[in-house]
């Protein structure tokens, strides 16, 4: 190996190490639950954390069905505890997996582990926020027989995860002022959704307020409070789940 080639390889290796290190540091700067969420939910005592899963169980009743939720990029699972607990209180088991490097796209098959949280549950929904929804749709595309339906929070299906031939239903909830998952993106990708898709727009809502972790770069400022947006999410999810449960 001549000296010039060796020098080029060394430079490329250094650049690769620097890039990998920078990417790792970027993934560690996560979006954590706000003080408001910690006032609304006692995560340590009200949420079970086991085998890399955050589990929200119904109280004094057997779960009707299960909901597996994939977080948005770099968002801590507990940032969704408010709405997840409310959905659990209504009778549905909610499981939020921890993702590799906090990126759901690196853990598309985490649903397999999540289902082990309660082997007695026979029917599962898969859901996701933003990029978490993209990862969830990739799982649904490959395992349509394992899920009863899907829920998007500020997310959408793309041609790469075309679900237009899927026989399960989809609930798509999005914010009017979402600067990341815009209405243009949602409308432009509707053809990739299942025929049985329900759309619900939260007036004044944005992307970040599908969790409770504070503002996010690229998003627009919401015109409703974080709790008000979450309460609408809870209402629509439960209305839809209960309707599907009657089928």
Q: Language-model segments: which ranges?
A:
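Gly/Ala-rich beta-loop-alpha elbow adjacent to hydrolase catalytic centers
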Residues: 128-136
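Active-site-adjacent alpha-helix of alpha/beta-hydrolase-fold enzymes
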Residues: 174-228
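Short beta-strand element of the alpha/beta-hydrolase
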Residues: 64-72
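Conserved alpha/beta-hydrolase
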Residues: 84-104
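Short beta-strand/loop motif that positions the catalytic acidic residue
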Residues: 166, 172-174
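N-terminal membrane-anchoring alpha-helices
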Residues: 1-45
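Active-site glycine-rich loops that stabilize anionic/oxyanionic intermediates
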Residues: 71-75, 176-177
């Amino acid at each position: 190996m001549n000296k010039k080639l060796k020098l080029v390889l060394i430079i490329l290796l250094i650049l690769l190490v620097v890039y990998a290190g920078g990417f790792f540091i970027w993934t560690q700067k996560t979006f954590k639950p706000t003080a408001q969420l910690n006032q609304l939910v006692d995560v340590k005592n009200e949420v079970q954390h086991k085998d890399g899963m955050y589990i929200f169980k119904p109280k004094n009743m057997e779960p009707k069905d299960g909901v597996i939720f994939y977080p948005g990029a770099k968002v801590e699972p507990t940032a969704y505890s408010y709405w997840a607990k409310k959905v659990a209180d209504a009778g549905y088991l909610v499981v939020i997996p921890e993702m590799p490097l906090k990126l759901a796209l690196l853990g598309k098959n985490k649903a397999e582990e999540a289902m082990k949280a309660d082997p007695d549950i026979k029917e599962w929904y898969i859901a996701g926020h933003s990029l978490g929804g993209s990862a969830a749709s990739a799982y649904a595309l490959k395992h349509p027989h394992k899920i009863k339906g899907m829920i998007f929070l500020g997310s959408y299906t793309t041609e790469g995860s075309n679900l237009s031939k899927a026989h399960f239903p989809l609930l798509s909830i999005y914010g009017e002022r979402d600067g990341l998952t815009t209405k243009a993106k949602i409308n432009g990708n509707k053809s990739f959704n299942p025929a049985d898709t329900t759309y619900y727009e939260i007036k004044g809502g944005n992307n970040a307020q599908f969790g409770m972790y504070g503002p996010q770069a690229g998003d627009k400022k919401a015109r409703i409070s974080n709790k008000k947006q979450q309460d609408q999410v809870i209402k629509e999810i439960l209305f839809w789940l209960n309707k599907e449960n009657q089928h």
